[in-house]
Structures are given as structure tokens and as C-alpha cells.
UniProtKB/Swiss-Prot annotation:
Family of the protein in this entry: Belongs to the UreF family.
Keyword Cytoplasm found: yes
InterPro entries reported for this sequence: UreF, UreF_sf
Quaternary organization: UreD, UreF and UreG form a complex that acts as a GTP-hydrolysis-dependent molecular chaperone, activating the urease apoprotein by helping to assemble the nickel containing metallocenter of UreC. The UreE protein probably delivers the nickel.
Cellular compartment(s): Cytoplasm
Protein name per UniProt: Urease accessory protein UreF
Cytoplasm found in the keyword field: yes
Xref: Gene3D superfamilies: Urease accessory protein UreF
């Protein structure tokens, strides 16, 4: 019997994907609050949630945002963004058009349809002007006048060769940031609380992006019925500052 027993060492190997600096900067610019898409005008139903008492403070805002991100449009938009990126990379113009039609059809109300289509068209037009490339011009020619926002972002990133996972993560974080910004204007929540909520939700965005950047369209689905109904009621809300 040997005096020294053989030992087996198990090493946990992890693959780290790094986004090139120029691509990271491009995503930061595209999804910046200063990008001319009009994101400041939309609250995605948050204004009604405040009006009816669903969002009353930082805790209820955090819960509301987490639900929208993980069970509502946040999750679906990340899937659609990834699908548009994949179709653009493959040169599948027909597939991209179908993804766009589906994305527009998923908007449950007139206001949420306007929110995604107006921002999508504005994003595509601005990106074509500032970051032109033949692949993106081809995409723009093939799509309808109405372009869903996540489809526009995914297609632009695919046309420019920006990594899909990074694109989906950046889109998801921008989705949450825009809603936190809206909350600061309409909910009893201050900047410190808003920043804390954003920090708490960032790991969830990263986890969703990791899980969804390769997901197919069959993964689409939502469970935010109260928000969807609220988007209808917002249309006739007596006093409001947002378009959704």
C-alpha cells in the first residue's frame, strides 16, 4: 500500500468574454439618456402605477421594476433584441421582418405600441446618420416604417458586429435606467433611493442577459397583466406628464 495516496485536483474553469472597448463605448452611446429616441417621454405604465397606489415608495418601486424586468416587457425585449441581432448577423431579412412584426404585435396597448415604435424608428434613424454601415442600411430598407425599439437596437448591434450578450445586457440595463429616471419625476422616490434600486437590479439584468441572449422566440411570454391594463387606463388619466 503506497505511503502517499494520489490526489486529484479539480479546477473550475470559467470562460470570460470581453467586449472590445470600441463596442462597449458604442453601446454606451446608443443607450445613453442623451441619445435622441425620446425615452424621457415614456414611463411604461409607471405613471399609472403611482396614480393607483401600486408604487408608493422605494420598496414598492423596486418590486414593480423587478416584475417588469423579469416577467414583463424587460424580459421579452431582451429576447427580441437577441433575435434581431441573430437574424441580422445571418443576413436573414425575412426573419428580421417577422421578428419586428411580432415585437410590435406584443405591445398590449396603443400607448405601449407608440412607446416601442417611436423609439425604435428614432433609434434606427439616428444610428444610420451617426454610425452608417452597409449592413444597417440594408436592414433599414427591409423593415417597415414602424420598428420596435429592441429590434432596432439588436439589428444595429448585429450590423456593426457588436457582441450579442453585451448588447442584450446593455439594453436590459437601459430599460431599467429609463424607468428609474421616470420614477424620480413621478414617484415619491429620491435620487439616492433610485440609484440604490438600480444597483440592486443590475445583477438581475446580467443574469437575464446570460440566460436570454441565445434564447429563441418560443421563450417569449409575460405575466404583468395589471401593468398591461394600467397602460389602457393611463390613456384617460386626468393628469399626466408621460406618453405611456
Amino acid at each position: 500500500m503506497p505511503a502517499v495516496m494520489p490526489m486529484t485536483t479539480v479546477t473550475d474553469i470559467r470562460t470570460i468574454t470581453r467586449t472590445p472597448m470600441i463596442d462597449a463605448l458604442r453601446l454606451m452611446a446608443w443607450l445613453s439618456p442623451t441619445y435622441p429616441v425620446g425615452a424621457f417621454a415614456y414611463s411604461h405604465g409607471l405613471e399609472w402605477a403611482v396614480e393607483c397606489g401600486d408604487v408608493r415608495d422605494a420598496a414598492t418601486l423596486s418590486d414593480w421594476l423587478a416584475d417588469v424586468l423579469e416577467w414583463g416587457a424587460g424580459r421579452n425585449d431582451m429576447i427580441l433584441c437577441a433575435a434581431a441581432h441573430r437574424a441580422t448577423e445571418a443576413g436573414d431579412d425575412a426573419g428580421l421582418a417577422e421578428i419586428n412584426d411580432l415585437a410590435l404585435a406584443l405591445a398590449p396597448s396603443r400607448e405601449l405600441h407608440l412607446e416601442t415604435s417611436q423609439q425604435g424608428r428614432s433609434f434606427l434613424d439616428a444610428t444610420l446618420r451617426a454610425w452608417p454601415c452597409p449592413a444597417l442600411s440594408t436592414v433599414a430598407d427591409r423593415l417597415n416604417a414602424e420598428v420596435a425599439y429592441p429590434v432596432a437596437v439588436g439589428a444595429a448591434a448585429g450590423a456593426h458586429g457588436v457582441a450579442r450578450a453585451a448588447t442584450v445586457a446593455a439594453y436590459g440595463l437601459a430599460f431599467v435606467q429609463n424607468l428609474v429616471s421616470a420614477a424620480l419625476r413621478v414617484a415619491p422616490v429620491g435620487q439616492s433611493a433610485g440609484t440604490t434600486i438600480l444597483a440592486a437590479l443590475t445583477p438581475r439584468v446580467a443574469a437575464l442577459a446570460e440566460a436570454l441572449h441565445e434564447a429563441g422566440l418560443d421563450a417569449l411570454g409575460s405575466a404583468t397583466l395589471r401593468l398591461d391594463l394600467g397602460s389602457f387606463r393611463h390613456e384617460t388619466q386626468y393628469s399626466r406628464i408621460f406618453r405611456s
